[in-house]
Amino acid sequence: MSNNLYDDSIRMLWASKLVYSFAKLLQEGRAGGLDLADTFPPEVLAAYKDERLDVRDLGEGNGLSFNAVLKIVVANAENLKKIEPEFEYVAKMIEKIQAVENADESSDELFLETFSSIDAATQCVYGVLKDTKNKRVTVVFRGSTDFSTRDWQTNLSAQLEGMKTPKLLKDGLEGELKKRVLVHRGFYEYIFDNKRAKGDQRYDMILNDIKPFVEEGYKIYVTGHSLGAALASLLAFKLAGSDKSWIPKPITCISYASPFVGTDGFRTAFTLLEQMGHIRYLRVNNDADTVPTIPPFSLGWKKRLYKHVGINLRLYDDSFILSHPNSNGWGFVNAVRNSVLKPVWSVLTYHSLQTHEDRMDAQKERLQHMNLDDLYANEELFGTPKTSLCG
């Protein structure tokens, strides 16, 4: 059972933003652009130059406490001013987190376990967090770093890739969907088609990261912003459809400003997993953000149109709409209109996590009276795709 929509979502937002700042510090430090000797704990500094930061043995076996992570970010304020365009927002967010948590390291309940930036060329960065209070292990994907990297070339590409349909869905699907669903090739390759020299897939690495905590009774959460949201969607789908007995269901995914991930066949399979109770997905986006409308389509006919999945929390300045998607073609028309007509500045303004947080704060009281389990039990919302709930 989730706590409430606001608390669950805002913590995922904070994690998504902090993974940006933490990654920037590590990458600049590795490249020699920053001296981190005075701002990182010695035991962390000893490991940070590796592609993979494993801190599970710190904190009496709990990992690097979230408060310790915050202290690292705060200690690097001057460094972050040089490399973090939204430094003022990060500083305000940290103050807010510290006020909400109102705890020192001795009472910490959230810990960073591993942090991986496997390939500098593709910028696939993720962290694994352990929440001892709520018994959750969360995979946090970092999103696109700026509008000129390969990350955004991947976001804007429209090629499709066949992803194997989970075995447990085959009896409920027809035709080609029994074999595969079509998803965004670039997003797929980040996680599932990237064998390194040792033959490891990032997906396998993530499984190895989370399995010890799942075996201790932890539930699995996934989150990310922008590109990170797309990766979170695919990982959640893969985990929810897995026949591995140790993976608990449902998988919970809360994403921010996700671009399209798959076609209508992917949506059909995803919705079936929702109906089976294997996945719970809240896809949060700002009205007027262009990124959730790209890429609107690949080459081909209607079955090549991209479709969104999950319950959508669409945020406005003074309201919100909760809806579940459908396949009636309206999404395509709306996506093309939005992506063509909206100016570039709207991406910068409305794509920011700061705008997401401001709008969620404006609706905090209403969102705190909802939770994701109840939304999925609401037949008006989930059972009848064309309906929506407004706030």
Task: Tell me what each language-model feature is.
Residues 1-223, 227-391:
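Non-catalytic, mobile gating and regulatory segments of ester bond hydrolases
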